[in-house]
Amino acid sequence: MKPLWTSAQVEYVTQGQSSSDWIANGVSIDSRTIEHGDLFVALHGPNYDGHDFVSDALSKGAAAAVVDKTREGSTLKVGDTMKALQSLGLAARKRTEATIIAVTGSVGKTGSKDAICFALSRQACTFANKGSLNNHWGVPLSLSRMPPKTTYGIFELGMNHPGEIYSLSKM
């Protein structure tokens, strides 16, 4: 199976510096959900700093951690981890020829996205964001998880403030 990301690709996309060579089969921003081979992106949140969980993510099998603070272990140092995640999402979209479908609205986004995914997955390689990952963190995270050979990408976009859909649609 071809890796989702290599250290060289992520270095290029994020303009970061990797401490070692690695391959990643997934991307995560939550150390509690790390799967072996994931790339962990240490985001700064309103209540937690992902950098506090880098050691935990690596001990659970993360291939590397994207950080903007120096940490021990397999890391890729960038200027801003949120911008790095956005860059990964944009790069994932550029490297595929997938038809991208965005689902927005007040009610029924997740169900509609899942129904479209179900129908299209019968025809070709289809990727959709998991659950309701539809905000400024979830959309670039979901895009960064999209395999290069995807034919259809279905993404839910939500908003908490005016103009948010516009910025998410630019991803």
Where are the model-predicted features located?
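Phosphate-binding loop of NTP-binding sites
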Residues: 8, 84-171
